[in-house]
Structures are given as C-alpha cells and as structure tokens.
C-alpha cells in the first residue's frame, strides 16, 4: 500500500491565520492517522512579498501547536527543476508565450464581461506571426507563459465534496511563468507534488478551480493526480478569513487572547465536522478520532468567543501535573497544587491565575464599593474558630444567617467583595483556606 504523504504549503507573505492553520492541522492529522508523512513547503516564488521573517513565524506557530514536520523545503531552492519542466512543456506545446501587458489584459477582461462572456483568456497569442512577436521584442516586451488547457471535461472524486466536474472550455489558461521569469504557484506546486510523492491534498474550497487546472498539469506530465479534499471556508461576520484580516493570527490568539495550544488545535481540528468540539489534552487523542469524512460541505462559522469558552473548559479539566510545566513557562511556578485546584474553574486564560494569586496574597484593590461596614464587622466576629478549611464557609454562612437573617447574594456578595475586590470568582469555600483566619479578619475589618 502506498504511504500517505500530505503537505502544507503556505506563502511566507504574512502570519498564519485560523484559515490556513486549519488546513495545516487537517493535513497533519490525516498523515498521522495513516502512519504517513507530513511536509512543510514554503511557496516563496513571489520574491517581492515573501520574507524570511514569515517563514520563521510559520515554523514557530506550527511548533507551538505541536505540528511536527517530517520535511521542510522551499520552492526557491528548486528553480532549476521548474525550468526543466518548463522546457519540457514548451516542447509538448502545453506552455505558450504571451505578450499582452497588464493593461491590455484588463481591457480584454472588461470587454468579455460587457458581452456577457466569461473573463477567460482568448488565446490571441497563439495566432501571433513571427513579425508581430519580433515587434513586441523590439518594444522591450518580455513574454509570460500560459498553460494550454485541453477543451475537455475534468472530473475527480473529492473526499469531502464527492464527485466534481469542470468543463475545460470554461477555464482560462493560467499564467505559470511571469514576464520577469519567476514562476507562479500553479505549476510549481504540481511539480513539487510529483517529486515529493504527495498522495493527498486537503485545502480550502477556494482552490477547487485550481484543482481542475492542476489535474490537467499532472496528466500533461503523465502522472496520476493526488486525492483531493476541499474544505468549506471559515466565515466570520460574512467574510472569509484571510491573512489580511487582523485579529485572526495564531500569534494574536496565543499572545493577546491567551489561548492554550491544545485549545486552538482541538477547535480547528474539529470545526466544520460532525464531531463534537471537545478540549483534547493531547494531540495524539485527536489523531485517534480524526475522520476526513466527518467534514461538511457547508460554510463554517467561526467566533472567537467559542475559542475562549473552549479554553476555559480545557483549563478546568487539567490536573496540576498536567499544567505544571505551563505554569513555569508563564513564570508562575510558585503556584502549588492546592491553589490550582481552588481557582482553575474561574480561569479564562492561564495567566489569570497570577491575578488570583495577587488577590489572595497581596492586599486587593477594593475601591469605593460602599459596603455595609456593620454587617462585615458582625460577619468577622462570627467566623468559626480553629483552622479554616473548605467546610468553614458552610458553617460560617449558617451562623451569619441565624444572626442577621441574610441569605444568598445579600449574604455572600459583601463578603466576596471585601475579601477579593471582585463580584465573581472562585468558590469562597475554596478561597478561605488560602487566605487563612488572620487575613480574612484583617480584610473584613479593613472595610469597617
């Protein structure tokens, strides 16, 4: 049986966003599910926009999300190979030179649209005489090259969308070599997929028409195309996600929102599938449950709130030994197991635990809360004697109710505010043993 090999091929022209990290995750998961290989390829043929900084950022983000790459390469290192295939396809008359300027092509496009015709290239360059070509050369024009698409049906089976059919006549011959001699993504990608034995390609549905074109490129090179799967796009506020829309970058979700790696990995590995989005603690468990057939054809809605809520669920589920190393990473290795278990249910992000440590072990900022001083003084006098434990709260509240008649919010909110300066937070029963008797009385009396 052929070994499964997948790839993730970002252009290093910006930071990873939620749309392309989802593609990376699903390709990685599919490869690992089938004991295969995952390749990272940088599509860096756009010399003007591709930056080494973005390559570094992409590798950093993948590492953060526990996506390990079995192989990494960039397209710039393979230019001689691309030129070899370029010459082969020119000789086979599947690549042809064109001399139109950008302005001329735009005029042609507008003209066809005005006539109700699809804006595809008219292949005028195929009818140029030697004299016309020589004139263009004398004018200083340099040719760009297009791939000649056969006017025949193109069909394939998609792992998500099922049977897909295109008519070659409805597609425009794509530019594969620019006038400056640089290669576009379209042909380079096919050459790489052939040379690196890529068996499966999972990508966004905005690439469906590219797939139709690339299938003819595979066939022109006498190769069998990989198996394709096209994911529905991630939609936020009726817009598809792109690297040019701010706030969706992985670095932002990690550093600004404070999300855990497994929150992001769990969410985007399951988003758009029929499987329940669950905060997995390890990526190995995600691999075990992954099924490409579970993904829907329908558009996928993304809301950052859902990610933040999942992060909260993940933190609640983590035992101390599972979070100890992460606490060191955020310089909070002073947090012990007892404190973690007492406050984890109230953490939206891991760094929140520092705030709760400060609240418990430094004087909280109470502000002008206009609390009932007489009530707090009376409550301090009713605090149970002896060592403060989690059971002390229930004993204390009974004493307060018997003495004052207060219950519920009227009873606990003034005490919570006096002790923590917050209207919400961890169960007071768990906070009391952390504060201890002297500090509890001190904070209640300080209000009075």
UniProtKB/Swiss-Prot annotation:
It catalyses: tRNA(Glu) + L-glutamate + ATP = L-glutamyl-tRNA(Glu) + AMP + diphosphate. A motif ('KMSKS' region) lies at residues 240-244. Its EC number is 6.1.1.17. Disulfide bonds: none annotated. GO terms for biological process: glutamyl-tRNA aminoacylation. Transmembrane segments: none annotated. Keywords: Aminoacyl-tRNA synthetase, ATP-binding, Cytoplasm, Ligase, Nucleotide-binding, Protein biosynthesis. It comes from the Bacteria. Belongs to the class-I aminoacyl-tRNA synthetase family. Glutamate--tRNA ligase type 1 subfamily. Catalyzes the attachment of glutamate to tRNA(Glu) in a two-step reaction: glutamate is first activated by ATP to form Glu-AMP and then transferred to the acceptor end of tRNA(Glu). This is Glutamate--tRNA ligase 1. It comes from Rickettsia typhi (strain ATCC VR-144 / Wilmington). The gene is gltX1.
